């Protein structure tokens, strides 16, 4: 297995400078990662650096809290694509999930999928804030709406990916959707364990350590 093919390299800290971004993307090119995930304002910069590679760009949407309206999320996705992204990592409305307002959760997923049928869409649940039943329900709604990935975490809450959550998500989505693990993945061994548990993408900023 080539672990680099699973890696979504992330640089999402708010104080990342252009110098840091350039160095990070250069490392991503050397390591030949699958995708680079950045904030919307940095997409164009990354696109220029990787223009002669096969690396994808994913833009984050309503990150990290997910509390924008669906209309705003759709507009942000449009802007990400205009700037050069070809994948999207959007944060679900966590409040609606905790309220068990599944109609609103479904409506958001449905409107986003129907608006963008031909790009890879990953939905972030922030699993550390959810019960097992809530994770299951979110996965079922994601599958129903044909989202491409269910994703564990933003990396900005109290905990990141766990083996248990990845196994649970994989069990629910089966082969109808894929699982992305992210948050707190700082070693190669942990990344490999998550892949073994069912993750098909690994989101990490620790590229040198994970791909050593």
UniProtKB/Swiss-Prot annotation:
Catalytic activity line of the entry: 2-deoxy-D-ribose 5-phosphate = D-glyceraldehyde 3-phosphate + acetaldehyde
GO cellular component: cytoplasm
Annotated localization: Cytoplasm
Entry keyword set: Cytoplasm, Lyase, Schiff base
UniProt pathway annotation: Carbohydrate degradation; 2-deoxy-D-ribose 1-phosphate degradation; D-glyceraldehyde 3-phosphate and acetaldehyde from 2-deoxy-alpha-D-ribose 1-phosphate: step 2/2
Gene Ontology annotations of biological process type: 2-deoxyribose 1-phosphate catabolic process; carbohydrate catabolic process; deoxyribonucleotide catabolic process
GO molecular-function terms, A-Z: deoxyribose-phosphate aldolase activity
Position of the signal peptide: none
Pfam families assigned: DeoC
InterPro entries listed in its UniProt record: Aldolase_TIM, DeoC, DeoC/FbaB/LacD_aldolase, DeoC_typeI
Gene3D superfamilies: Aldolase class I
Coiled-coil zones: none
Enzyme class: lyase
Catalytic residues (positions): 89 (proton donor/acceptor), 151 (schiff-base intermediate with acetaldehyde), 180 (proton donor/acceptor)
Physiological role: Catalyzes a reversible aldol reaction between acetaldehyde and D-glyceraldehyde 3-phosphate to generate 2-deoxy-D-ribose 5-phosphate.
Protein name: Deoxyribose-phosphate aldolase 2
Organism of provenance: Mesoplasma florum (strain ATCC 33453 / NBRC 100688 / NCTC 11704 / L1)
Lineage, uppermost ranks: Bacteria, Bacillati, Mycoplasmatota, Mollicutes, Entomoplasmatales
